[in-house]
């Protein structure tokens, strides 16, 4: 979708809408891919219990797929994650284990590992290190972008949560368009990708507080740090100027887009 607010600048600023996925986000793609990959490998069986740390949207996707396929799912989340996301997961039948806010995603990951150890027939998708995460975006997200932009784009700008999205899409697009500039977006308060220290921040969905295993930094041309104020500002502008309700991480990406445009 081309954003109207940039048209007068002779710059085509396009946003890929993922809200039409069944669970309302891009994470539905990796939830299905990771579960079906494990099924094909015989790792996931009908009596398996899915346990996964999540900041929200992957949990929604896993709960949705688990409901359809008949799996029990336990999601481990920092207590700071939105109540709205938790309610949606509960509707799909998910169970919860909440971890202290100050421990961030690392705390949720550690707790999930503990639960896997003590729970019979437990399986964890491991979204931060599962190659099926990257594969899902190579096979679907990247191909859809190529269909819409057969002649390529100049910039790919997106936030980094698990690293699967930016890695999967960038690996495909850069092979076709070597001059593509790939920009990773992270919270100013927790600039781990830039070499900074992890810290709590309100931009849910990005900035896990560590560098994910599947994140390929060699594909990244630049990293932009976005403040919480700018993330909220552009999230609000997306609603008031484009009539699109996006998340705070989307606002962070749009703030990074604005920074890039200022340099052109």
For the regions a language model picked out, list residue spans one by one.
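Active-site/ligand-binding-proximal alpha/beta "capping" segment
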Residues: 119-161, 217, 229-244
């Amino acid at each position: 979708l081309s954003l109207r607010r940039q048209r007068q600048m002779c710059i085509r600023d396009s946003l890929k809408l993922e809200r039409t996925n069944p669970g309302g986000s891009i994470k539905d793609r990796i939830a299905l891919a990771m579960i079906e990959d494990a099924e094909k490998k015989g790792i996931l069986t009908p009596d398996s219990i899915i346990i996964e740390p999540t900041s929200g949207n992957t949990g929604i996707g896993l709960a949705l797929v688990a409901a359809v396929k008949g799996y029990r799912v336990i999601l481990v989340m920092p207590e700071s994650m939105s109540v709205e996301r938790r309610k949606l997961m509960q509707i799909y039948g998910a169970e919860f284990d909440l971890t202290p806010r100050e421990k961030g995603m690392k705390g949720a990951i550690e707790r999930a590992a503990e639960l896997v150890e003590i729970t019979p027939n437990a399986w964890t998708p491991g979204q931060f290190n599962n190659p099926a995460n990257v594969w899902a975006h190579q096979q679907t997200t990247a191909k859809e972008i190529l269909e819409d932009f057969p002649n390529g784009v100049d910039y790919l700008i997106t936030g980094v949560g698990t690293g699967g999205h930016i890695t999967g899409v960038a690996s495909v697009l850069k092979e076709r368009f070597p001059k593509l500039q790939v920009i990773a977006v992270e919270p100013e308060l927790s600039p781990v990708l830039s070499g900074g220290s992890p810290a709590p921040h309100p931009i849910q969905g990005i900035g896990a507080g560590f560098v994910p295993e599947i994140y390929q930094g060699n594909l990244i041309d630049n990293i932009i740090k976005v403040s919480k104020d700018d993330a909220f500002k552009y999230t609000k502008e997306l609603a008031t100027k484009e009539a699109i309700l996006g998340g705070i991480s989307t606002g962070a990406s749009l703030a990074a887009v604005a920074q890039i445009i200022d340099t052109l």
